[in-house]
Amino acid sequence: QMDMENYRLYPDPAATKLVKALAAEYGVSDKQVFVGVGSDDVIAMSFLTFFNSDKPVLFPDVSYSFYDVWADLFKIPYERPMLDENFNIKPEDYMRTNGGIVFPNPNAPTGVYLELDNVRKILDANRDVIVIVDEAYIDFGGKSALTLLDEYDNLLVVRTYSKSRSMAGLRIGYAIGG
């Protein structure tokens, strides 16, 4: 229930109530949760924060179209490993020198889900860089990488309320990491 008096106030910039609610929902500390103005904002802030070396960031050649937009905007070098003939991410293509990794799971626009064993292979081979798993469509199928947070401090899972919850207008995006 909203008090009409609150409409005149600016929102809490830290989104404290939302952060605490998300932390409680996922069983993590509120220090592990970052909230942004939609997942695009969260991904952009993550690019600025974590992808700042001269090494290329890796993301699939067929994938969410804003990854290269953010990389170009922020002058971050990147490479786009090709999907296989069935539109699968090939984990071995992400086992090379890089400045970070980001991929959607399930992939957008292909809808192909990368099994957690393969996500784990990518994480194991890249312990010195941040690996962002963009789970905008995870509620439509597959297991979340959130179950891997206790094992990998280099994992950042990004989610949104825009897709499966049909709340795009609220602009709620968030990241959970170690």
What is the meaning of each model-derived region?
Residues S29-V33, D54-P56, E135, D153-N154:
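Short acidic capping loops at alpha-helix termini that bridge into adjacent secondary structure
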Residues T16, T49-P104:
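PLP-dependent aminotransferase-like
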Residues N6, S63-Y64, M82-F87, Y137, ...:
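Short, acidic/turn-prone active-site loops that include or flank metal/cofactor-
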